[in-house]
Every structure is written in C-alpha cells, then in structure tokens.
C-alpha cells in the first residue's frame, strides 16, 4: 500500500517539474521520477523517526494508537511489496469475528510476524515478542504504541507479568494477541519444542486459540531482490474457549504440536 502511495507524490512532483521546465527532455523524466520517489520515501522515514521520539521506550500501553498503527501497517505492506512477497492465504474465514483470540504459529523467519500481521490486519492484533525487538531503532517505539509486549523467557516472573498484561488487554477488548510458542526461529524448518506457558494467555483471557502455520518465509532473504517469494499462511483450526479453559497447557501443546507437525510434514 505504501509502495503505491509513494508513487503518487513522485508522479505529481515529476509532472510539476516537467511543466515548469519546458526545455526538459523526455529522457530526463525517468531519472526525475526515480529521484522524487526516493525523496518521498526519505520524507516518510523522517516522519517515522520524529514520531518514534514521542513513544515511551519502556512503556506498556493500554490501547492501540490508530495513527501509529496506520504508519506501521503501511510500512509493513511496503516492505512486503519491495521484497516481492506473494502471500497465499487459506482458512481466513475461520478466524473469529465476534471475539478476541490468541493466535499461535510455527516460526521460521524474521518475516513471519510481518507476513502474518499483514494477513490478519482486519483484526486488532498485537504480538508478544522478545525484548530486543522492542528496543529496535524507530520500529521499537512504533510497535509498543500498537500494544506489542516484550516477554523475558529467561525470567519466569517477568514472563508471567507479560502473560497477565496480554490477558488483561484481551479482556478489555483492546486487541487479540499473537505469539510464537517456540520462542525462536527454527533454522531447520522443523517444529521446535513449545513453551506451554504461552497458551496461558488464552486461558486467563478465556478466548479461543487460532492455530496457524507459515511456510516459505525462510526463503525470502535468499530470493530478494531477484526472485519472487511465495509464502503460504494457513489457518489450521480454532480451538474454542471452553476447550482451552478445560484443558491443561501441556495437553493443549501436545495436541496442537502433533497436528502442526502432521500438517507441515516435519
């Protein structure tokens, strides 16, 4: 989306320059258009930098900022377009529209949250992620304003604080949450052991669990910029809130992982 929005001021600027400079040759139109496109992108980056200064670096927010969300989602779509990522989606109709939920998925690449957040952009959705992602230049403050939460898996008490915070936001109907229970990327594409405690978010908030899978993101870095990457996002099943509440996290983990391994063939 942002990719095309940047073309609008670039084309308009090029048209103005052309009509104000009658002696300008047609051969100069393409370089001028390219220069205006780059300039428009630089202005957007500058805007994001300035806006990031107004977001608290360590603060947890209790509502999503529509302004920061719009800018971040636009950037997300822009990056996906520039990287020539074609997303194939299956089962999106299974995602609840009448309640919040916890979204869980396998994790193969740093592109996973970008792809899946874009696919689920119709739903207010925040991610639980590692603390280092919240400290990233410019992006960190932006995702915090979108209610993303850091989780310290090395400290059980801090992790529980994050789980409770996510559950509270869900109960307050602020947003749904997404988490990768593996806790890190699988470099072999095989499903890694899950942190069962991640599912406590759904139990505490009394919401369903949406189980998704992602395939193909592990090839994006190798394909850019020469080849298009095909990524497959599938919504496998939705576990009702009643079942989530009545089942232990270990049993839920065993059931979900078993089905996910069978679906992925790993």
What is each of the regions a protein language model found here?
Residues 1-18, 22-100:
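Membrane-anchoring hydrophobic helices of lipid-metabolizing enzymes
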Residues 100-102, 174-180:
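Residue-level preference for the first positions of well-ordered beta-strands
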Residues 137-141, 145, 175-178, 187-251:
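A cross-family acyltransferase "interaction/gating" segment
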